[in-house]
Amino acid sequence: MLKESSKVKKENISKLMVSFSDPFRLEIIDLMMEGEVCVCDIMKLTKLSQSRISYHIKILKEAGLITDRQEGRWVYYSLNKESLFLIKEWITSLTDYSSNRKRCCE
């Protein structure tokens, strides 16, 4: 049985991975790799509607992949480095496991 912290970590990774499953969200993530953005920036650069962007932002926020900060009436979004580190750590563990694993017939 999984330890509780391990189970929570896997649930978090699962949510994060789902957030990568849409090409529009990947496009939004690419924009955030250059720094924080507001919805109006995303609209200009992607030609997506405000409602569609808000939908994708909601999914990215719920997954913990992005954070936001409000400045006056504007909300700026940026990537959550802790979540990116969690994904990187998990993928690294997968590659380490597969490279160190012995084949069944060896």
Features from the language model and the residues they span:
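Alpha-helical residues within the helix-turn-helix
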Residues: 44, 55, 61-62
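Short acidic/polar alpha-helix capping motifs at helix-coil junctions
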Residues: 2-6, 38-40, 53
